[in-house]
Amino acid sequence: MKKIFAIAAAALLFTCAVNAQTYFNVGYGYGMNKVQFGNLEPETVSSNAITAGISHNFAIDGNFGIEAGLNYMHDWNWEGLEANDKKTGAMSRFDGLNVPVLVNYAFPLASDFTVKALLGPKFFYGLSDKTTTYAGGEKGYVVNSYDDENCSRFNVSASAGIAGEWCNKFRFILGYDLGITDIDKSDSVLRKQSMLTFTLGYIF
């Protein structure tokens, strides 16, 4: 998995070295994380995320291109109750990097507006994954998934999206990342991370 992440990062550096179109992106993600314990029915745990990063699009031939990027992501989820400013439950927070390597095809609809279809893998590397418990407003124990070696830092998803670009300056992307790899290291738990994303970008 480390080799895959290194190859993806190398693809980003390659696109920087050539005459590539550069984007600055910020976005929001709605996580739909599939969790299954043993033979029990899987459940979906939702989360929220914000992202920021840069990407470069290299035109291959005609309307085809390859876009590679590097993004920072902060993801959080709260499960519990809160009353009289006292909360009981658990707060999970994830920080990480992702490298999308997406093939795209452009459909020019007007002189100043283009639609693109994007498809390809997205590689994730986790920096921090912690869950903090609270009882009656008091902070309890903290579980660090990486220190406890419960989860893999590396993850791969299949990404697809539709982008709109106008005036050669602005763009938006509506995308979906389908989690492929099981990031939980135990044999009794299945955990895959998927996310619906909305991104705004500025074109340099």
Regions found by a protein language model. Name each.
Residues 32-46, 75-96, 126-159, 182-195:
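Extracellular/periplasm-exposed beta-strand and loop segments of Gram-negative cell-envelope proteins
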Residues 15-20:
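Sec/Tat signal peptide C-region and signal peptidase I cleavage site
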Residues 57-62, 103-109, 166-168, 180, ...:
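Outer-membrane beta-barrel proteins
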Residues 22-24, 62-66, 110-113, 168-174:
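Repeated loop/turn-to-beta-strand initiation elements of outer-membrane beta-barrel proteins
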Residues 48-54, 97-101, 115, 119, ...:
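Hydrophobic, lipid-facing positions within transmembrane beta-strands of outer-membrane proteins
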Residues 24-28, 68-70, 101, 117-119, ...:
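Membrane-embedded beta-strand positions of outer-membrane beta-barrel proteins
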Residues 23, 192-204:
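Outer-membrane beta-barrel "beta-signal"
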Residues 28-34, 72-76, 98, 107, ...:
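Transmembrane beta-strands of outer-membrane beta-barrel pores
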